[in-house]
């Protein structure tokens, strides 16, 4: 029979163990599935969202801008032809809690090569349309988006005559 004597830990052992646990926790969070499909504003982290959302479509019906579409089982945010009003009606009708009220979407505009301001030096329609004044540019330059000001509403995209605005996910989209 083995004796049950207390094991002595040095301070170094304690910190080594804490660092190892911290690294393990970091890698667990890092292994969460990354979002590849834009969800309605306030969508929880993708894995949680998919677990909670029952695909009822109430958010689609509640959206006054018709920018939420049910694709397969889950809702997607589509800002191709209209913008999100960020009215939170989708979150208010969500019976499962998969959507929370939000003041931003998870998307940011990016500007493609064919941007008229960059090529021709005269177009500022996206700047004029932006309700938060998040887009700025110099003549003959590609517009730049201030990520802190941009709410991802999409008002800039439908107005673009060159169809030069595309979407990227914010760096930290998971909640």
Question: What are these model-derived regions, one by one?
Answer:
Residues 1-175:
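Non-ligating segments of multi-cofactor redox enzymes
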């Amino acid at each position: 029979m083995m004796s049950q004597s207390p094991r002595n830990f040095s301070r170094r052992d304690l910190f080594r163990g804490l660092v190892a646990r911290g690294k393990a926790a970091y890698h667990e969070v890092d292994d969460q599935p990354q979002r590849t499909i834009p969800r309605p504003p306030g969508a929880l982290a993708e894995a949680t969202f998919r677990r909670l959302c029952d695909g009822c479509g109430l958010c689609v019906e509640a959206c006054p801008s018709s920018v939420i579409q049910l694709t397969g089982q889950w809702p997607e945010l589509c800002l191709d032809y209209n913008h999100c009003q960020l009215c939170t009606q989708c979150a208010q009708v969500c019976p499962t809690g998969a959507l929370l009220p939000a003041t931003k979407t998870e998307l940011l505009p990016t500007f493609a090569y064919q941007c008229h301001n960059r090529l021709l030096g005269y177009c500022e329609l996206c700047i004029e349309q932006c309700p938060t004044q998040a887009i700025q540019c110099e003549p003959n330059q590609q517009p730049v988006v201030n990520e802190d000001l941009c709410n991802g509403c999409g008002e800039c995209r439908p107005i673009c005559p060159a169809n030069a605005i595309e979407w990227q996910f914010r760096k930290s989209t998971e909640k």
